[in-house]
């Protein structure tokens, strides 16, 4: 990567100037000289010099790497212009994943209650979690993707109770999770709901004993059909009943009780409970005390989350795993009493949970620190995201106001089919093209925005072939693929024939790896999504460039040598778009 090599050279020169820092090199503004630039304002105080003088001194001291043509001080920046042939060679270099580095990153996402169909709110969780897992793997991390199955929770108990209580019989046609979800909604609308609580409690206890696992699994398998349709990937399923059976909660609480900040008050409102004082880690709390174990001996969900986190990071052991029989994910493993012992011992975790769970996630990190693992607490990340509206409406599964992911997929595919029919009536496989476009529209809309901002999914906007959409990027890929298909094979490119148009496109291609690394480091896919939008726009500008009313960048009819250069650039662009889309879990159609 030329940018990182330039950063290394600058860091070495600054070290010789007495400032051992590494500054980030960024693209220079288009109205300024140079391709890249480094800001030097932050060094003014330490060096007691104006930034302009620092820029000149750095230029004088810096041995320019061979791929840099010149360094130009611009105010408080030092800008760099790359040699065109070096720039082109780097842009044409085949893309490959970064070298693997040690240490497991565990990404937990989806983790939907196994009691009904997935709704629109779950879409963002799945799209974000799956994309960040793919991005991290490409960036050189060993990634494990985990889906947590809360089979001992109240929601699962209520659904199983409702199916029996109302004597509901599945017709074999309706998707089973939708059938189960209707029973759940019916129970919550039942005026006798409060009177039924003791019977629901009996089902809950049966779930805790692991007696109704197959009934829960039936709902889970139906949910997994949706996850598979969304192109999400998983490595492990962890069932809460197995966590209970393995005694992880008791082990975690015993470990925490060794801390002076975890105790059992003898009087006051917390009398008899096991309480954690989070104030040493989370200062400024109005009430720093959090109950882990109630006075009646029942655990709070804080405590369960903490125990699970301790297992993820190798502090506790006790879960066993075996292959999971299902038609969607051949290599998937599930926790089970009869499996083989396994602990991931992750050095870093990312829990994809909506922003409303920020406080519980902070308590998980606090528990790690108070248990004596402050370094692991720093590596326990929460990828928080805001809610999703559908055409301006808020969702509520309990009230039956949610729109299912299956319905969104079906409607988006129906609309995409009409668009494909209109734009390309001779398309060889309209159904597959519609599926790809629909998936691209849905998943891209869920990751293109910064996670902490609310999004409003609207079909017409998301499916547009123009603007900041998945289909816009997919269409750019298909256009590039069409040119390559017509070209057949070609010879070696003549880099010396490059025009400013090729140079500009090559410079944008160089930003791909930087976008991947930034998305991985910041743990947010929207950085990569925005890069793909910018690259697609750059490609469209290149494709449509005109001079004196004539096409300025013809590819197939260009002179020999330049034709090969342009084809090679188009190929690099096509591969970059395809790789980038795949890292977001989106297919790259060859024909649209």
From Swiss-Prot:
Pfam families: Arg_tRNA_synt_N, DALR_1, tRNA-synt_1d
MF GO annotations: arginine-tRNA ligase activity; ATP binding
Catalyses which reaction(s): tRNA(Arg) + L-arginine + ATP = L-arginyl-tRNA(Arg) + AMP + diphosphate
Uppermost EC category: ligase
GO biological process, one term: arginyl-tRNA aminoacylation
Assembly behavior: Monomer.
Similarity comment: family membership: Belongs to the class-I aminoacyl-tRNA synthetase family.
EC number: 6.1.1.19
Name of the protein in its database record: Arginine--tRNA ligase
Subcellular location: Cytoplasm
Domain of life: Bacteria
Keyword Lyase: no
Sequence motif 'HIGH' region, location on chain: 112-122
Organism: Thermus thermophilus (strain ATCC 27634 / DSM 579 / HB8)
Organism ancestry: Bacteria, Thermotogati, Deinococcota, Deinococci, Thermales
SUPFAM superfamilies, per database record: Anticodon-binding domain of a subclass of class I aminoacyl-tRNA synthetases, Arginyl-tRNA synthetase (ArgRS), N-terminal 'additional' domain, Nucleotidylyl transferase
Keyword entries, A-Z: Aminoacyl-tRNA synthetase, ATP-binding, Cytoplasm, Ligase, Nucleotide-binding, Protein biosynthesis
A Gene Ontology term for the protein's cellular component: cytoplasm
